């Protein structure tokens, strides 16, 4: 039985997150001031506690991008667990190469923090994650569902994750939250995906919804920007136009 946690909670499962060095993970010198400043929107500790993270787990971070969450996960898992980063292929697209290259450079700049990370190619269906089936305790997907929809790889990505997870393992998803009734094209264009759509896709892949909550909700997010979610911080896709307005809204409303 695999478990899907679709939303990030403001509370935690009792007993599931003992022995974690949150001070180092959140306040260590390996994190920039700007990245620490985003904690107010992303609530990393509350998020990971809700998902049930513990120090001895093998955790898969799917498509970690620039490594914002890697900064938090790596110190928490280094001594007793394992962090697997499922990133893009070195021989992929120009964007994929830049993303992977930047990620590896980040790991190299603070090797003492990141030395234990196992970086793997994960680009299903062509290049599925090369780990043993049933070897992962927890898989984490941070704001990547819209990218799957754009690439047409949602089904393959969820199947790859399902294969990697142990029986009873946990899939935790954070995603820009859209409104019911959106078309798939609207989801692709704006990066907002309805909660019901995410749950539907995960359940179709064999996952079972176990919990959801509102810790990363943002009622100020009107979700009606011509430039989609990238209009809001940190991207500020509209440049200086209405920048103060979008800064006051903050980062997106997230499931």
Residue ranges of each PLM-predicted region?
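A short, conserved alpha-helix within the catalytic core of class I
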Residues: 124-125, 147-160
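S-adenosyl-L-methionine
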Residues: 96-128
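Conserved beta-strand signature within the Rossmann-like core of class I S-adenosyl-L-methionine
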Residues: 83-84, 168-177
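Class I SAM-dependent methyltransferase Rossmann-like catalytic core
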Residues: 20-50, 54
């Amino acid at each position: 039985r695999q478990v899907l946690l679709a939303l990030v909670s403001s509370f935690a499962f009792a007993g599931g997150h003992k022995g974690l060095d949150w001070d180092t993970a959140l306040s260590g010198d390996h994190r920039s001031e700007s990245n620490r400043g985003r904690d107010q929107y992303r609530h990393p500790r509350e998020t990971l506690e809700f998902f049930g993270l513990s120090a001895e787990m093998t955790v898969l971070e799917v498509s970690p991008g620039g490594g914002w969450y890697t900064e938090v996960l790596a110190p928490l898992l280094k001594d007793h667990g394992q962090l697997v980063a499922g990133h893009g292929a070195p021989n992929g697209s120009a964007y994929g190469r830049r993303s992977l290259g930047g990620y590896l450079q980040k790991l190299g700049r603070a090797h003492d923090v990141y030395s234990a990370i196992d970086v793997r190619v994960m680009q299903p269906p062509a290049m599925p994650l090369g780990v043993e089936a049933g070897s992962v305790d927890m898989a984490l997907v941070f704001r990547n569902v819209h990218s799957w929809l754009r690439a047409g790889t949602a089904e393959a990505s969820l199947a790859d994750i399902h294969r990697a997870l142990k029986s009873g393992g946990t899939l935790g998803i954070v995603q820009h939250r859209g409104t019911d009734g959106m078309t798939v094209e609207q989801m692709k264009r704006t990066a907002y995906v309805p909660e019901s759509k995410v749950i539907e896709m995960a359940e179709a892949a064999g996952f079972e919804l176990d919990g959801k909550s509102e810790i990363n909700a943002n009622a100020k997010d009107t979700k009606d920007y011509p430039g989609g979610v990238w209009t809001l911080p940190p991207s500020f896709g509209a440049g200086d136009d209405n920048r103060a307005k979008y800064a006051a809204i903050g980062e997106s409303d997230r499931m």
